[in-house]
Amino acid sequence: MDTLCLSHHFLIAMPDMEDSLFARAVVYMCDHGEQGAMGVIINHGADLTLDSLLGQIGLDGCRPDQVGLPVFVGGPVQSDRGFVLHEPIGNWQSSLTVTDNVALTTSRDVLAAVSHHEGPERLIVTLGYAGWEPGQLEHELAQNAWLTVPADMRIVFDLPVADRYDAAIRLLGIEPSALFGSAGHA
């Protein structure tokens, strides 16, 4: 039997998702295996910018092109902790390698490097992450709570936040307006 692995995929919330935290969410999946799954929501802003976050934790500034970058609500788990999804991988104290070029870092050194204009070329910062116990995500998928598609990092790093949900759906060849909230089982 093939094992489902959704690392480096998007989970796209179905339109009828009732949990307000995950309504219209696009989750970039960082890890999925026997121990469960984890990812970060890439399209729900936290009413905070990267430069203001750096100031709050005692770090000075960021590159001019990073001023005003939104910080995201990454999910309900460890929502008081920062998670940096970035390219390239680099050499940071605490990183989870997702692909040959993408990592999720939780150590302060990556933010310190950003404040000194030496951090990763492309990044988003989230507060918290979305996590699933073993079998929980598979159950939600069987209940048609999520769509899945291989991730396109241009959606993560290049698209305006408001366009990410529809763009992720279009990766499936579906127009968002044609997507209905529930599906049946034969």
UniProtKB/Swiss-Prot annotation:
It holds the Pfam family DUF179. One of its GO terms (cellular component) is cytosol. InterPro entries: AlgH-like (IPR003774). It comes from the Bacteria. Coiled coil: none annotated. Belongs to the UPF0301 (AlgH) family. This is UPF0301 protein LHK_02881.
